[in-house]
Amino acid sequence: PNDQVVYVVNDNYREPNKPFFAKVNLKGGGDAASAARAVLQTGDFDYAWNLQVEPDILAELLKGGKGEIKTIAGTSVERIELQFSDWKTETDGEKGKLGSVNPIIGDKAVRQALNLACQRDVISEQLYGEGQPPTSNILSGIAAMASPNTAWEFNLEKAGQILDEAGWTLNGSVRSKDGVDASITYVTSINPVRQKTQAINKQSMEKLGFQVELRQVDAAVFFDGSPGNEQNINHFFNDLQMYTN
């Protein structure tokens, strides 16, 4: 219920023979795999967009013979955002108050190390495929907007050196500095591709000495903008959050 919008042509539209379609049924909700299945396997819908579904599952759905997949490298980027504010501490009735400093992510060395711990090529090849290239630019897909001054690399040794030099010492399996453990939360929406991305990144981060708590939130909640919803991307009450934009 309440997950579909139906548009019907206006017979009095100002231009003759337009719009082309007499009726358009736009359906939301559900998950990416179900959307792909509705087009590729059952044929219930004509088009589905932003199918963040594993390549092997899409290949299987294609056997249904109802549709095809068109992949175009666009401007959307799956990214991990870092919370600079102290979201755990309440100041003047507000968590993550502007000007407060996240005791872990607020350290530039930590951010640099986390960046070096992301295997973009593995994530791209294994989980996305179809020519979805890894990138270091948040503005991507438009040559004129792509900075030539940024690059990415996966280098845990270099990341470890940066943390060592910044005073994040390894005590057992977890680093700490000034009495603060390198314990972080990492949230995204419930989606098989994103959960596998989380697992890949967590493994690398933990090798560096971070303690990582993975969190998953239903997409309808994660992307909901309600003021009272503390699990959405707008509140960002986590150290890391991941989604596409």
Regions found by a protein language model. Give the residues of each.
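Extracytoplasmic/periplasmic ligand-capture domains
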Residues: 1-127, 143-245
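Short, glycine/acidic-rich hinge or "gate" loops at secondary-structure transitions
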Residues: 130-136, 215
